Amino acid sequence: MNQSVQPDPKVVVALDFPKTQLAEDFARHLDPQLCRLKVGKELFALGGPQLVEKLITQGFEVFLDLKYHDIPNTVAMACRAAAEMGVWMVNVHSLGGRKMMEAAKEAVLSASHQPLLIGVTILTSMETEDLAEIGLTGTPKENVLRLAKLAHSSGLDGVVSSAQEASDLRKEIGQDFCLVTPGIRPANADVNDQKRIMTPADAMAAGSSYLVVGRPITQAKDPIAVLNEINASIGR
């Protein structure tokens, strides 16, 4: 008897909408076998756990992108709550340090449902001069590598980082570390406010595991066509 192969969509659509109804309406036009969904700070503030649970009920795997950054106990409790919500992925700021990340991982492992726990390294909108203003020396790439190594040694499943760093992260950390890449734009799309961007095919070739795509899909005249085009470009 043949067992069906579970889909593993590589595209994570960022539901960056100002109203929950808009996000829900948009999600209804998508296929859980073609993409996962990301719920960020604005949408979660508007819709809360109820929205996330509704999306999960519709068959979507959800990346809860709240970037927790606080004392270890507070972050641990937040990560456990997110895990019990049933999300596929949740993230914390690597700059919170080893103790915070280890507490977060322990909390996730103790939950009845265990999502991937991902560390945020350096925001894709930041460049060397931006880092210098907050007291971090070196380039974004150097800081991403340092924080990714810290996240890995703290037990996290992967990091959020731009595609430009993916090949170096693969060399330094290995193939089993999950790399979640925002700043993804199809070749004909506007770059908007993200500096370190790359096309979907180039990002996957560089070593990215999952691609976060927002406005090029959500603001497209034909979102499904764009999603299908991206999937085709990465061989999905």
UniProtKB/Swiss-Prot annotation:
Residues annotated as catalytic: K67 (proton donor)
Keyword Lyase: yes
GO molecular function: orotidine-5'-phosphate decarboxylase activity
Enzyme class: lyase
Swiss-Prot/TrEMBL catalytic activity: orotidine 5'-phosphate + H(+) = UMP + CO2
Entry binding sites for substrate: 16, 38, 65-74, 124, 185, 194, 214-215
Disulfide-linked positions: none
Pfam families: OMPdecase
InterPro entries hit by this protein: Aldolase_TIM (IPR013785), OMPdecase (IPR014732), OMPdecase_AS (IPR018089), OMPdecase_bac (IPR047596), OMPdeCOase_dom (IPR001754), RibuloseP-bd_barrel (IPR011060)
Biochemical pathway: Pyrimidine metabolism; UMP biosynthesis via de novo pathway; UMP from orotate: step 2/2
PROSITE patterns attached to this UniProt entry: OMPDECASE
UniProt xrefs under SUPFAM superfamilies: Ribulose-phoshate binding barrel
Annotated EC: 4.1.1.23
GO cellular component: cytosol
Assembly: Homodimer.
Described function: Catalyzes the decarboxylation of orotidine 5'-monophosphate (OMP) to uridine 5'-monophosphate (UMP).
Name recorded for this polypeptide: Orotidine 5'-phosphate decarboxylase
Lineage per the UniProt record: Bacteria, Pseudomonadati, Pseudomonadota, Gammaproteobacteria, Thiotrichales
Encoding gene (name): pyrF
